Amino acid sequence: MSENIPLRVQFKRMKAAEWARSDVILLESEIGFETDTGFARAGDGHNRFSDLGYISPLDYNLLTNKPNIDGLATKVETAQKLQQKADKETVYTKAESKQELDKKLNLKGGVMTGQLKFKPAATVAYSSSTGGAVNIDLSSTRGAGVVVYSDNDTSDGPLMSLRTGKETFNQSALFVDYKGTTNAVNIAMRHATTPNFSSALNITSGNENGSAMQLRGSEKALGTLKITHENPSIGADYDKNAARYPLILSKRQNGAGTAAQGIYINSTSGTTGKLLRIRNLSDDKFYVKSDGGFYAKETSQIDGNLKLKDPTANDHAATKAYVDKAISELKKLILKK
C-alpha cells in the first residue's frame, strides 16, 4: 500500500542586502524571502540565493498549495500579475503597484527576444524636468542617465532613433535645455584605424522653405560659428588639398543647373565692422570694410590687382560715392601744388 508524504516547505527570511552577502545555499524544499522587498526565490540545493531566479505567483502556488500571495513582490491584481520570463527574471506589467525595487531592477540572463514598450496616457506631463513617459532623476547620483553601448561589428539600426510620421507634428524631435559650464552637446568621432568617408555630424534637409541649420549667438569677442581645421599628420603638406570651409553649390540630379549664391553676407540693421576679413599668421591680408571698400592693409587700398570694368557704377563694390570722394581728395592735392 502506497503512502502519500506531503512536501514540507521551509522559509528563510532576510533583507535583500543580507541575502546578497549570504553564502547560504537553499535546499529544494526551501524558499527564501526578501523581507524588505517581498521577493522570493526557491532553492535548488546548489546555488546561493542571489544566483537563483525570483519565483512567480504560479511557482509559489504550486509549492505552497495556493496560500494568500498578497505578500509577494506586488499586490495581486485582477487582470495583471507578475509575469515570468524564460530566464526566471520577473517583469512588472502594472506601474500602479509602485513596488520598491531596492534602487535597481535587474533584467539579466538569457537572450531577450521581446521589447520593453511604454504607451503613456494623454495625461503625461511635458515638463523638461518632471514630465515624460520615462523620467530619470539624477539629482542624487553623478552617473550617466542613459547609456546605449554596442560592441557589434555591424548593425541593422542606429543606437538611438527618433522619428515622427506626421507632417503636422509641432515639437522638436530632440530638445536640450542646458545651463552648465561645458558644451551643451558633445560629439566625439574617434580616429579610425582605416580612415573612411564619414562625418561626425551629418545634417540633411529636404525642406525648401527652411534652412538646413540655423545658428544664433550672442558673443562678445568670439565667432557665432568657429571652425578649426587640424592637420591629421605631422607633415606640413599632408593636408594641402583640405579646406576649412569648403562650399559646394550643386544642381539637382538630372537638373539643368543652379543659380544659388555662394557666400551671402548681410547686416539688416547695419554694421560698422568689416564685412569680410582674411588673415594669415594673425596678419590681415585682405578685408572688405562696411562701406564696401577693398583693403589689403589698414591704409593700403587695393589698386593694381583689382580691375574694375566700371569704377563709377552704383552697384559695384567700389561705389560711385567712394570714387567721387577719392577724386575730390586728389583734386585738393593738385591745387596745393
Swiss-Prot record:
Keyword Hydrolase: yes
A GO term from the CC aspect: virion component
Catalytic activity: Random hydrolysis of (1->4)-linkages between N-acetyl-beta-D-glucosamine and D-glucuronate residues in hyaluronate
Cellular localisation: Virion
Cited Pfam families: Hyaluronidase_1, Mtd_N
Enzyme's top EC category: hydrolase
BP GO annotations: capsule polysaccharide biosynthetic process; symbiont entry into host cell via disruption of host cell envelope; symbiont entry into host cell via disruption of host cell glycocalyx
Primary location class: virion
InterPro entries reported for this sequence: Hyaluronidase_bac, Mtd_N
Keywords: Degradation of host capsule during virus entry, Degradation of host cell envelope components during virus entry, Glycosidase, Hydrolase, Virion, Virus entry into host cell
Gene Ontology molecular function terms on file: hyalurononglucosaminidase activity
Source domain of life: Viruses
Hydrolase as UniProt keyword: yes
E.C. numbers: 3.2.1.35
Stated family: Belongs to the glycosyl hydrolase 69 family.
Function recorded in the entry: The hyaluronidase of this bacteriophage mediates the penetration of the hyaluronic capsule of Streptococcus pyogenes.
Protein name per Swiss-Prot or TrEMBL: Hyaluronoglucosaminidase
